Every structure is written in structure tokens, then in C-alpha cells.
A protein has these predicted regions:
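Short boundary/hinge segments that flank catalytic cores
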Residues: 8-124, 130-150, 156, 160-161, ...
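Short, small-residue-biased leader/transition segments that mark boundaries at the very start
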Residues: 1-6
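Conserved inter-motif catalytic segment of the P-loop NTP-binding fold
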Residues: 155-181
Length: 309
């Protein structure tokens, strides 16, 4: 009887320990303090959550437009972009990989807004959509999906032919292309490196929008061709453990990590609601990203409809 009691007690303690460790693993990043204690990666700034008017369609382009008209967002992005630009110039970097630890952190919109901010500062900027499994850059810029990186990697396009000019005062873009999902293994190959080498002379900054590096190897393979990397961390989304693992993975591939930026920040913390990323009318911006075992795999509660990552 006593041995059974001891076994039951040990089993109960182990269960409590597993629950504790599981809870610790799920603790999400709420502020810079959560990461400063566990990583030496540089904090580059925080972007506020942006609301979309109730009657507006909550699409990637609508959210991007709302950000462009938010003075608080624009000022925060201006500061972040200046820090990034200064660091890249100091190290003579031209190409920067931008990723996130998990799906749904607003990475793609961050890339496009950063590109706009750097362009306003007089830099020649190119955005390349390297997320061939789930391309989203064209959605943020409100453009149809057209020939781009996938076609180039398949050998059916020249470097100059796949660049789309969005107009005066806007960055240029290489969209993912129509043959998405078929050329991902070539992102770490010679063809992609040749493309970047051909484009470096034409641009001051080349931003590579990649899949979340915690769940896809595409980002890490792309990183081998990049000069540096930046991680977008959505407040109260990815766990601290996944963020730390993503930073470590980038470092293990020899990609200098420029730092991280907090995204979609509010003062409300857990249980936040409202418009913008967090979901008016059942929209959950970036949630339900197409990775994982099935559609709807993601890190938010709402999964009815999705936007770009």
C-alpha cells in the first residue's frame, strides 16, 4: 500500500512538472524585457496595433493602407527603419532576410511597410517574396500574382524581367511567381545567389520576405545567401522558446542577426480584441497560415478568415 502511495505521489509530481514546463514553453513575448534576459539580439523597436474602420474590408491591402495613415505607426516604423538602415550601412550589408518565429506575426506587412519607409528616406529598395509556399507580398501591395522568383528559379526568366516597379516613391518588387511551391529547394542554391548578385548593384537594400523559420527550413536556406537577418515578433503570439530557437537557428546558419522588432503591440496584453490584425468581423490577420498539417494551423484563436502574414 505504501509503495503504491509513493508511486502515485511521484506520478502526480511528474504530471505537475510537465504541466509547469509546458506552460513555461507557451509563455509569449509581451515586451522587450521578456527577451532581453535570454538573448543578446538587439531590440530595434515596437510597432503599435493599427485599427481598420468597421466598414472597411479587412484585406492585406486595407490593413497596409490603414498603417500608412496612422501617425503613431509611421513614426515607430520610421525609427525602426533608421536603425536598420544605419546598421546595414555600418556593416556594408545589402540583403536582409526578414522572418518570424511563428505564422501570423505580421511579417510580410512589416517587410512592405519597412520598404516604404526606407524608400522615403531616399534608399533604393527591392522586396523579394521568398515565401514560395504561401506568397503574400502581392496581396499587401494590392497586386495580382504574376511571374516572379519561381519562374526565375525554374529558368524561365531573366533577373531584370521579374522586377516590378510600383511607381515613383515606392520600392520595386520581385513577386513569388505563379509556379509557387515548386522551387523552394532552390532558394539556397546558386541560381538564387546569382540573382542577388545581379540585383545588388541596382539597390541599396534588398529585403527577403521568408516563411517563419521555426517551422520551415526555407528561411534558413535563404539566409545563407543574405547578409543579415531580422526577426519580427508579434506581441502575445509566439512563445519565447520559439523566438529564442529561431534566433539560434539563424545564428547556426551563419546569418548575422541585426535584431528583432515587436509587432502589433497594445497595452492590453492577453485577451486583446479590436480591429486591424486582431480581427474585426471574424478576420484574424495572418492566422490560419498555410503551414502545418492542415489549413487553419496557427497561433491565434480566430481562424475563420485569413490575411497575409
Amino acid at each position: 500500500g505504501s509503495e503504491m502511495c509513493i508511486r502515485d505521489s511521484i506520478g502526480a509530481l511528474l504530471s505537475l512538472l510537465l504541466l509547469y514546463l509546458s506552460g513555461r514553453a507557451r509563455v509569449t513575448v509581451m515586451s522587450r524585457d521578456d527577451l532581453q534576459q535570454v538573448t543578446s539580439a538587439r531590440y530595434l523597436g515596437a510597432l503599435p496595433a493599427v485599427r481598420v474602420k468597421k466598414r472597411s474590408r479587412t484585406t492585406s491591402a486595407a490593413l497596409s493602407e490603414a498603417m500608412a495613415h496612422s501617425s503613431a505607426y509611421c513614426e515607430a516604423m520610421r525609427i525602426i527603419s533608421m536603425r536598420i538602415d544605419k546598421a546595414m550601412q555600418r556593416h556594408d550589408y545589402r540583403t536582409m532576410l526578414v522572418s518570424s518565429a511563428a505564422p501570423g506575426e505580421g511579417k510580410t506587412t512589416f517587410v512592405c511597410q519597412l520598404a516604404d519607409a526606407l524608400t522615403r528616406q531616399g534608399r533604393r529598395v527591392l522586396v523579394i517574396d521568398c515565401d514560395l509556399r504561401n506568397p503574400s507580398v502581392h496581396k499587401v501591395f494590392g497586386r495580382p500574382l504574376q511571374a516572379g522568383l519561381a519562374e526565375y528559379l525554374a529558368g524561365s526568366g531573366m533577373a531584370g524581367q521579374i522586377v516590378t516597379a510600383l511607381g515613383k516613391g515606392k520600392p520595386d518588387v520581385v513577386f513569388a511567381g505563379r509556379r509557387t511551391g515548386t522551387q523552394t529547394e532552390q532558394l539556397g542554391g546558386d541560381a538564387f545567389r546569382t540573382l542577388l548578385d545581379a540585383l545588388r548593384a541596382r539597390y541599396d537594400v534588398i529585403l527577403l520576405d521568408t516563411p517563419p523559420c521555426a517551422i520551415m527550413t526555407d528561411a534558413l536556406e535563404t539566409g545563407e545567401a543574405a547578409d543579415c537577418a531580422l526577426l519580427v515578433v508579434r506581441q502575445d503570439a509566439a512563445s519565447r522558446v520559439s523566438v529564442i530557437n529561431s534566433l539560434a537557428a539563424l545564428d547556426s546558419f551563419g546569418v548575422p542577426v541585426l535584431g528583432y522588432a515587436l509587432n502589433v503591440c497594445t497595452g492590453r496584453g492577453r485577451g486583446q480584441s479590436g480591429y486591424g490584425y486582431g480581427g474585426y468581423g471574424g478576420y484574424s490577420y495572418g492566422y490560419g497560415y498555410g503551414y502545418g498539417r492542415d489549413r487553419g494551423y496557427g497561433y491565434g484563436q480566430q481562424k475563420e478568415k485569413t490575411g497575409a502574414d
